């Protein structure tokens, strides 16, 4: 996994794009640390979104979009994970994926299911770009393939 601070987000992010990136980071943090949604959301709103941290300027993000993603993923995880599991092969099982990759796929799938006002291409491209910001290997291709397949089933 590449260090996000050492790489640039592939395209200039708007506030929703920044919210997606922050949501993936927050979901990762919640998975690793075990913190809750409200605690994590408050931390991001107070100390991260749009803030300067150790010389790095975090992007200004749409806080409501960020909150909807992290809240939705946590609430719907028991429905999201089986759907993702069906799309993954034995060597890429959900439990074997890197935590950040799981966060990317969960957030993207939640958005595909729940935000039908956002075009499929936007969701797929944004989360593939997020994957590219963290990974240099095949992971972005995996994100693209899984989301493309899921979108065809969810958004007929």
UniProtKB/Swiss-Prot annotation:
Keyword Protease carried by entry: no
A Gene Ontology term for the protein's cellular component: cytosol
Pfam families listed in its UniProt record: NusB
Superkingdom classification of source: Bacteria
Family: Belongs to the NusB family.
Database matches in NCBIfam families: nusB
Name by which UniProt lists this protein: Transcription antitermination protein NusB
Taxonomic source organism: Bartonella tribocorum (strain CIP 105476 / IBS 506)
Gene encoding the protein: nusB
């Amino acid at each position: 996994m590449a260090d996000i601070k050492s790489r640039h987000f592939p395209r200039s992010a708007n506030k929703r794009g920044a919210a997606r990136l922050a949501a993936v980071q927050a979901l990762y943090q919640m998975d690793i640390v075990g913190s809750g949604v409200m605690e994590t959301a408050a931390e991001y709103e107070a100390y991260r979104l749009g803030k300067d941290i150790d010389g790095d300027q975090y992007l200004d993000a749409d806080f409501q979009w960020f909150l909807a993603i992290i809240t939705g993923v946590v609430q719907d995880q028991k429905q999201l994970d089986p759907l993702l599991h069906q799309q993954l092969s034995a060597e890429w099982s959900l439990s074997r994926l890197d935590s950040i990759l799981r966060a990317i796929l969960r957030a993207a799938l939640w958005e595909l299911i729940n935000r039908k006002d956002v075009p499929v291409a936007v969701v797929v491209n944004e989360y593939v770009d997020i994957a590219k910001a963290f990974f240099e290997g095949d992971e972005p291709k995996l994100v693209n393939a899984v989301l493309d397949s899921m979108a065809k089933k969810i958004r007929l």
